Amino acid sequence: VHGKPATIDHFALIXVSYF
């Protein structure tokens, strides 16, 4: 379970994928 919202997780993943 993550301590931060799913929105932040998705943004982090996108970013990583985009970059």
From Swiss-Prot:
Alphabetical keyword list: Membrane, Mitochondrion, Mitochondrion inner membrane
Gene Ontology cellular-component terms listed: mitochondrial inner membrane
Chief location category: mitochondrion
Lineage: superkingdom: Eukaryota
Coiled-coil ranges per UniProt: none
Family: Belongs to the cytochrome c oxidase VIII family.
Protein's cellular compartments: Mitochondrion inner membrane
Protein name as it appears in the record: Cytochrome c oxidase subunit 8A, mitochondrial
Function statement: Component of the cytochrome c oxidase, the last enzyme in the mitochondrial electron transport chain which drives oxidative phosphorylation. The respiratory chain contains 3 multisubunit complexes succinate dehydrogenase (complex II, CII), ubiquinol-cytochrome c oxidoreductase (cytochrome b-c1 complex, complex III, CIII) and cytochrome c oxidase (complex IV, CIV), that cooperate to transfer electrons derived from NADH and succinate to molecular oxygen, creating an electrochemical gradient over the inner membrane that drives transmembrane transport and the ATP synthase.
